[in-house]
């Protein structure tokens, strides 16, 4: 199984945490030191913990489990979507709607509405409406697609979530915790690792770092799919 190399992590800036004044003391075990008032993450620890996370994700993927990738910050949005689609998995890459997991029955109704609107937009229904009516429905379709497009075919709650950024995705993590859904997350030095089953200490802001994590996970799931 491919793991994350120290060299690749250094090149991607995985080791750069936040300014020391913003740190969360609970991240102390994962910090190597300080450079120019910036916390430096211990990449040896990250390598070990990333491998542990990969092993567990591999088990879930091998059982055809559903993994929900969550990355709503700008730096993660496109990579999260690309990774999930490449892996035939699921994603939320815009705003996390409160209750997306804990109020799944209501979310399921919204997904049905999204699918109905998709059909109407393709079967000529929109063309039969006035311009104003069609515009209103098209806006609704776009909004629903942005919010729910990545989970519209999930068919139920995920078997795990992978969050890019523990602080930014704290609502998703809290909902997963309340439902007993395993949480994998990139956790930076300013974040609280509590409630995360598989902590991956690392920079959660740099696009290169985010791409590195997700590319390795994507490759692992692809290999798994080819071998089953």
UniProtKB/Swiss-Prot annotation:
Short name of any one Pfam family annotated for the protein: Ribosomal_S2
CDD domains: RPS2
Keywords assigned by UniProt, alphabetized: Ribonucleoprotein, Ribosomal protein
One BP annotation, GO: translation
GO molecular function: structural constituent of ribosome
PROSITE patterns documented for this protein: RIBOSOMAL_S2_1
Gene Ontology annotations for the cellular component aspect, listed alphabetically: cytosolic small ribosomal subunit
Keyword Acyltransferase: no
Gene3D superfamilies according to UniProt: Glucose-6-phosphate isomerase like protein, domain 1, Helix hairpin bin
Keyword Ribonucleoprotein: yes
InterPro entries the record matches: Ribosomal_uS2, Ribosomal_uS2_bac/mit/plastid, Ribosomal_uS2_CS, Ribosomal_uS2_flav_dom_sf
Family the entry assigns: Belongs to the universal ribosomal protein uS2 family.
Protein name: Small ribosomal subunit protein uS2
Organism: Blochmanniella pennsylvanica (strain BPEN)
């Amino acid at each position: 199984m491919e793991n994350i190399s120290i060299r690749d992590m250094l090149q991607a800036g995985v080791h750069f945490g936040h300014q020391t004044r913003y740190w969360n003391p609970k991240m102390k075990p994962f910090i190597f030191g300080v450079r120019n008032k910036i916390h430096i993450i211990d990449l040896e620890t990250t390598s070990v913990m990333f491998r542990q996370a990969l092993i567990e994700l591999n088990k879930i993927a091998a059982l055809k489990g559903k993994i929900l990738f969550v990355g709503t910050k700008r730096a993660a949005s496109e990579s999260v979507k690309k990774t999930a689609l490449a892996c035939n998995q699921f994603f939320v890459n815009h705003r996390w709607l409160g209750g997306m997991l804990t109020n799944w029955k209501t979310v399921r109704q919204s997904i049905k509405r999204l699918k109905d609107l998709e059909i109407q937009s393709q079967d000529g229904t929109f063309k039969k409406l006035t311009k104003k009516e069609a515009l209103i429905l098209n806006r609704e379709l776009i909004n629903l697609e942005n919010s729910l497009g990545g989970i519209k075919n999930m068919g139920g709650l995920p078997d795990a979530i992978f969050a890019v950024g523990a602080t930014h995705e704290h609502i998703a993590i809290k909902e997963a915790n309340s439902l007993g859904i395993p949480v994998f997350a990139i956790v930076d030095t300013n974040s609280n690792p509590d409630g995360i089953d598989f902590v991956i200490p690392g920079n959660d802001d740099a696009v290169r770092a985010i791409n590195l994590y997700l590319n390795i996970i994507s490759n692992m799931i692809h290999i798994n799919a080819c071998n089953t």
